[in-house]
Amino acid sequence: MIKYVLISALLVVAVYSFTIEDNEDALLEEAEDELDTEEERRMALPPGAVCNGHKSDCQCFGAKYKCSCPLLWRFRRSAKCHCKKGWAWTAIKKRSCHNRYQWSG
């Protein structure tokens, strides 16, 4: 019985430690995103330009343009993402972009 209690306690501690690490990683990503928003505010990429697939669609100029990447682009070095026209929901998603003043009329 005591073995089960100890094993359960160790399992809870292990899960808790992984959760704390995930929270720290999330905080670091949020800090990096805040720095990236300053760059996004300054410049939006024109349609057809090469964009960073790891960042948001806000980097592409226009309400309906998104950063579109080819299939399995993360595993191919030569694959590049480009700003391409998306669907109507892309415009809805991009309403929260910090640089929307550049393309909104």
Curated annotation (Swiss-Prot):
It is found in: Secreted. One of its GO terms (cellular component) is extracellular region. Expressed by the venom gland. Residues 18-41 form a propeptide. InterPro entries: Toxin_34 (IPR013605). Its main location: secreted. Keywords: Disulfide bond, Ion channel impairing toxin, Neurotoxin, Potassium channel impairing toxin, Secreted, Signal, Toxin, Voltage-gated potassium channel impairing toxin. Belongs to the neurotoxin 04 (omega-agtx) family. 01 (type I omega-agtx) subfamily. Disulfide bonds join C51-C67, C58-C97, C60-C83, C69-C81. Residues 1-17 form the signal peptide. This is U2-lycotoxin-Ls1a. One of its GO terms (molecular function) is toxin activity. Insecticidal to house crickets. It induces an excitatory slow-onset impact that leads to irreversible spastic paralysis. It also modifies human voltage-gated potassium channel Kv1.5/KCNA5. Most likely, it binds to the voltage-sensing domain of the channel, suggesting it does not block the pore but prevents its opening at physiological membrane potentials. The recombinant peptide binds to the channel in an irreversible manner and slows down the hKv1.5 current activation kinetics. It is not toxic to mice, when intracranially injected (at 0.5 ug/g mouse). The keyword Disulfide bond applies. It comes from the Eukaryota.
